Curated annotation (Swiss-Prot):
The lineage of its organism: Eukaryota, Fungi, Dikarya, Ascomycota, Taphrinomycotina. This is Condensin complex subunit 1. Keywords: Cell cycle, Cell division, Chromosome, Cytoplasm, DNA condensation, Mitosis, Nucleus. GO terms for cellular component: condensed chromosome, centromeric region; condensin complex; cytoplasm; euchromatin; kinetochore; nucleolar peripheral inclusion body; nucleolus; nucleus. Its main location: nucleus.
Length: 1158
């Protein structure tokens, strides 16, 4: 009797609460499940020639409906039974179809019964969260809890695979002969396909390659032979939206169906359906799953996606940025596929039309409102231009767009724009010429040669022309009028003869080749223009807030250097300042480490296969070259870098030996800059290891302090810097002291006593004094002798007063210069020598102050050591002499010693009867007081600087002469003096805190100085004092904020750096915002400045106020000012500031809407 499949489905599948099956299963349990299963197996296997026994089927269905509760062995038996049934019935079915039978009732009924049993087993596993047929520690579907009472350790993969193989064999039959109507056939197929889709819901199942392959083959056969396309499309789309892990596997399934089973209908239908879906604003999961599916599908079958592009691009208008990102990646996959197809043919420089249109579409998305989409476009362009393609013009177009992205407001976009720009540089299409270098000078020189070659190949004019027509601009001439007369025929004939002669003399291929080469050079130069423009913008990102941008920028300039970009050296020098970036997080350390890595790559890693000597020469040469044309700031940063590397032991002993060889070479003259560079680097390395200088101490005495140093004062100055590094070890503590009689100390003294009129003498003097205080055992005694000797030299009678009148040689010299000229020369010489003496005295004074503080610290250290030793040796008596020495140290209290040092500093140095400095103090004050009466700027510079140093010694001296110092600062026309005094005032604020309020006012005034160098020095000084907590700021921050819009880029950059650091200190910008705003608004109105500057400053400052609580409070405080605004402009300023704050109450918005009222 034929089984009614529909009624069976309703009874056993659709009825979730089937009490009949539950009661039968209970009976089976009582009878023993294993025995019952064995009976069912025997019965069904023996009755394959007829329909299965109804009672036996009831037991099978009951057991299958509780499949999750069965033991592993029973499960295996059930699946083996189902596999055997399907295989045997499929064989019977095949024989009947081959025999053209018409009655398929028995195999049809038995297969339907087996399908129901199979579906019951899977439904039971699904309801119990045991869908995984592979043993794993986690056998649950994501998001569901595991039921600990169930059998979750079933490893039935082999048994299930056998069943799936049997289903594959079944689906290969001509089932349309058996189930003739589509509804019957679909109902039968669903018995097997629904469990297949259910098994795919398990992430563990789908990850198994062999299992997944069988599932996909079953679905593919159903689509290919049994009209399952529509049902498959529905199931795949539903699964996409419910199961996260199926997104990419579903794409694999569609790919297999399309390629292996020759059915594109399924893929096309799914794409059309997905492109028409609409998602809720809160739905994040749905768009993400669809996006993953489309991206995976486009990577597998890009040609199909190209055909469906009209449907796919609709998603570019979706509100979900996830879907827009997916379509961007889909377009990229299609482009890459098209490029690969073209690569199989001959590579062309022209872009295919399809690729051109797709890349244009991608370029448009660089204007997408979402930064994620803009970033995705840059990502895909990186993938595209990583391919071996040329497309020089398209590259230039993209490069120009990337330059715009470098200025994007999103750091993610900027960072990836740098990556793309680096990719465009490293894969540029001009590598066939000049070894791939993009050095402008090389290409310009090559272009000029090509143009000369092209001019030589051009036909020479044989017609005689009037001289006045030789210089006619050909752009002014129009084409010849087409009039057929004798003259025109004659001219044409002449031209034809000329061209025919030229064609005979020059091959046409040669002209074409040269013209193509010229075009190649022109395109290369255009590309170089774009790279240099991008490099200029990227250089601004070296100091960005986002650390990833900084690292990408550094890598870009390393690439630029390797490709010979002319401006790269400038930016690499700028990059070295990042060595100072500190941070408690890994980001700060990463930046410093990355700077070191970049510089190692650029300068300190010799070419491969270099010998030891060649490698040392390479490193030493590059170390010296880093000092060429370097500014003071660059040298300071280089010093920090080399100190770090030296402490890490990066430079070998041979490299240091090479540096000393360059410094001490005397067989022939060498470059001054090279010798200077060697000692500069040696001095820098000595910060990390003082042994570097000690290694060449004799060379320092012979070269830097000998004749070469006397001829080159800059060399002598850097030699003194290296010498003073001897006195400090890497930790900064005292290390080595030489007796005053040592050759080194005596050479330093002789250097200071040597007269000189060079401008470099002041710098040499300063460093020589510091070297004496660093290495001499008693530096104060040496400096006293130097000052006395210089004073005697200066004030002793001049030679011409003591010479006799009958000295013929002297008379001859007197005849050369008039008495007036000689007097002027003597006055100028005396003024310079006096300036040197005054400068030396001032620097000795400040170093003596440091020396006194060092003595005080050294006393305290020795006293502590003595006390510790006394305790340790209390049980071990020592001889009387040692005890007496300890008593001498410990007998004096620290307070007494400190008071003695303070008295010396305050009363002895500048006021003591026997003090040498006290003799010069009145002279310095007199020179500064009468600075208008003489025109010697060097003397005034030295005197004012020495005055500020003297003031640091004594509080009384400072109070007495502070008005004089401020007068010079306010009225002096020399910007160098004003610079020095700004720094001097900063030193006074550190030395004497009670002068801060009085001094700070004059410091802030220098921010409005007419000289930009003074403003820069003042801003740096104030920034240091504020960040160090030496000055408490109030309204003065508004004056500093105006520097954000200074015309000098150096000052505006400093201002940005200052406010960035200032904002990180206890919400400082928020706390002072109202004061800053008031100053800026008032100054903008008083000076009638453009409000654009005011708005840019306020926008920059509000970017530091991020906390919601602060923005609300600040909005309330600003809103309270609206009613107090006296002018429309003031009101507009407040409203603009409020517009920048995201949190505003309704009452504030109402005040704004009401507008300004007088």
């Amino acid at each position: 009797m034929s089984l009614d499949l529909l009624s069976r489905l309703k009874k056993y599948i659709h009825d979730e609460e089937n009490s009949d099956l539950d009661s039968i299963y209970a009976e089976c349990e009582n009878a023993g499940l294993t025995a019952v299963v064995n009976d069912v197996i025997d019965t069904l296997l023996l009755g394959t020639s007829s329909c299965f026994d109804e009672d036996c089927l009831e037991k099978l269905f009951a057991i299958c409906s509780h499949f999750a509760d069965l033991s592993s062995s029973v499960r295996n038996k059930v699946y083996d039974l189902l596999t055997s049934n399907i295989s045997s019935e499929s064989a019977i079915l095949e024989d009947m179809i081959s025999a053209n039978a018409t009655d398929f009732t028995v195999p049809q009924t038995n297969l339907e019964t087996t399908g129901i049993a199979f579906q019951l087993t899977v439904n039971s596993l699904s309801s119990s969260n045991q869908l995984s047929v592979i043993r794993s520690s986690t056998n649950t579907v994501k998001g569901r809890k595991k039921n600990p009472t169930t059998n979750s350790n079933w490893n039935g993969i082999s048994h299930v695979n056998a069943l799936l193989d049997a289903i594959i064999t079944l689906f290969q039959k001509k089932l349309s002969r058996v189930w003739t109507t589509s509804s019957e056939r679909d109902m039968f197929l669903s018995l097997f396909l629904k469990p297949i889709y259910t098994l795919m819901e398990s992430e563990i199942n789908i990850k198994n390659a062999s299992f997944r392959s069988r599932l996909f083959n079953i679905i593919g056969l159903a689509v290919q032979f049994h009209n399952h396309t529509t049902a498959a499309e529905t199931n795949i789309i539903q699964n996409l939206q419910y199961f996260e892990h199926l997104s990419e596997y579903a794409a694999d399934l569609v790919h297999i169906v399309t390629v292996q089973f020759n059915s594109v209908t399924l893929a096309e239908g799914i794409i059309r359906t997905l492109c028409s879906l609409e998602f809720n604003d809160n739905d994040v999961k749905g768009p993400k799953q669809v996006a993953l599916f489309l991206v995976r599908l486009s990577s597998l079958i890009p040609n199909l996606c190209l055909k469906q592009l009209t449907q796919l691009v609709k998603l570019l208008d979706s509100e979900s940025y996830t879907l827009r990102c997916a379509i961007i990646e889909v377009l990229a996959n299609v482009v890459i596929d098209q490029i690969h197809d073209e690569a199989q043919n001959e590579m062309s420089e022209s872009v295919p039309a399809t690729v051109q249109s797709l890349m244009d579409l991608l370029s448009e998305r660089l204007l997408d409102i979402s930064p994620y989409c803009r970033t995705k476009v840059l990502h895909v362009f990186i993938k595209i231009f990583d391919l071996p393609i040329k497309y020089p013009r398209k590259r230039q177009e993209i490069a120009e767009l990337v330059i715009r992205c470098l200025q994007d407001r999103s750091s993610h976009v900027r960072r990836n724009a740098i990556k793309l720009f680096s990719k465009l540089l490293t894969t540029h299409p001009f590598s066939v010429m000049h070894n791939g270098l993009l050095t402008r000078n090389i290409w310009e020189k090559g272009l000029s040669i090509i143009e000369e070659q092209l001019n030589s190949l051009q036909p020479k004019q044989q017609e005689k022309v009037v001289d006045s027509e030789l210089e006619v601009d050909e752009n002014l001439l129009e084409d010849a009028t087409m009039i057929q007369d004798d003259e025109s025929h004659e001219g044409e004939s002449h031209l034809e003869n000329s061209l025919s002669e030229y064609v005979d003399s020059v091959p046409a291929e040669e002209i074409v080749k040269v013209n193509l080469t010229k075009r190649f050079y022109l395109e290369a130069l255009q590309y170089i223009d774009i790279v240099e423009a991008g490099a200029k913008i990227i250089s601004q990102l070296l100091f960005a807030k986002n650390k990833s941008e900084v690292i990408e920028s550094m890598d870009f300039f390393v690439f630029c250097n390797s490709f010979g970009i002319s401006s790269s050296k400038l930016y690499i020098k700028k990059m070295i300042h990042l060595i100072w970036v500190k941070g408690t997080s890994d980001e700060g350390n990463n930046i410093q480490n990355h700077v070191l890595s970049c510089y190692k790559t650029l300068f300190f890693e010799p070419p491969p296969n270099s010998g030891t000597n060649e490698a040392a020469n390479y490193i030493a040469r590059n170390l010296i070259s880093l000092t060429y044309d370097a500014s003071l700031a660059e040298l300071t940063s280089l010093e920090q870098m080399l100190c770090i590397l030296m402490k890490d032991g990066y430079f070998s002993h041979l490299v240091i030996t090479k540096l000393w060889q360059v410094y001490s070479y005397q067989k022939k003259d060498i470059s001054r800059t090279q010798r200077r560079g060697s000692i500069i680097v040696i001095g820098m390395l000595a910060l990390g290891n003082t042994d570097v200088v000690m290694q060449g101490l004799d060379h320092l005495i012979q070269i830097g302090l000998g004749p070469p140093g006397l001829e080159d004062l800059v060399l002598a100055r850097y030699t003194c810097i290296a010498i003073k590094r001897i006195g400090k070890d890497a930790s900064g503590s005292s290390n080595i002291n030489f007796p005053n009689s040592h050759t080194l100390c005596q050479k330093l003294c002789m250097l200071l006593l040597r007269p000189s009129f060079s401008e470099e003498w002041f710098g040499l003097e300063e460093q020589a004094i510091e070297a004496i205080y660093a290495v001499a055992k008693h530096p104060d005694e040496l400096c006293t002798n130097i000052i006395l000797l210089l004073t005697k030299q200066l004030f002793k009678p001049s030679n011409h007063e003591n010479t006799t009148s009958n000295d013929d040689h002297a008379m001859d010299e007197d005849l050369d210069d008039s008495p007036e000229e000689e007097t002027l020369k003597d006055e100028e010489e005396i003024g310079i020598r006096l300036a040197h003496l005054i400068f030396l005295v001032g620097h000795v004074a400040i170093k003596q102050l440091v020396y006194i503080e060092y003595c005080e610290a050294e006393f305290k250290r020795r006293k502590a050591d003595a006390e510790r030793l006394a305790v340790q040796n209390s049980n071990n008596p020592i001889n009387g002499q040692e005890t007496s020495e300890y008593d001498l140290i410990t007998g004096t209290s620290e307070d007494d010693f400190s008071e003695a040092m303070t008295f010396i500093r305050e009363r002895e140095l500048l006021y003591g009867e026997n003090s040498l400095l006290s003799r010069f103090a009145p002279l310095v004050v007199e020179l500064c007081s009468n600075h208008k009466s003489h025109n010697n700027q060097s003397l005034l510079l030295a005197a004012s600087l020495t005055l500020s140093k003297f003031m640091c010694l004594s509080n009384n001296f400072c109070m007495e002469h502070l008005p004089l110092l401020i007068t010079i600062l306010e009225k002096c026309d020399n910007p160098i003096i004003r610079n020095n005094l700004v720094i001097g005032l900063a030193d006074l604020t550190v030395c004497f805190n009670h002068f801060i309020d009085e001094i700070s006012e004059y410091l802030y005034r220098r921010l409005m100085d007419e000289e930009s160098s003074v403003k820069k020095t003042c801003f740096m000084t104030l920034a240091f004092l504020i960040l160090a907590g030496q000055i408490k700021v109030k309204g003065q921050l508004g004056i500093m904020a105006r520097s954000l819009e200074d015309e000098d880029a150096r000052i505006s950059d400093l201002a940005r750096m200052f406010f960035t650091d200032f904002a990180a200190k206890d919400n400082s910008v928020y706390n002072n915002f109202i004061d800053i705003f008031s100053v800026l608004s008032r100054s903008a109105e008083e000076q009638d400045e453009d409000d654009a500057k005011f708005k840019r400053i306020i926008r920059f400052l509000t970017s530091f106020i991020e906390k919601e609580r602060h923005t609300k409070q600040l909005a309330e405080r600003l809103a309270a000012r609206l009613d107090r605004c006296k002018t429309q402009r003031q009101w507009d300023h407040v409203v603009y500031a409020l517009s920048l704050l995201p949190h505003k109450a309704d009452n504030i918005q109402k005040l704004i809407d009401d507008g300004y009222h007088e």
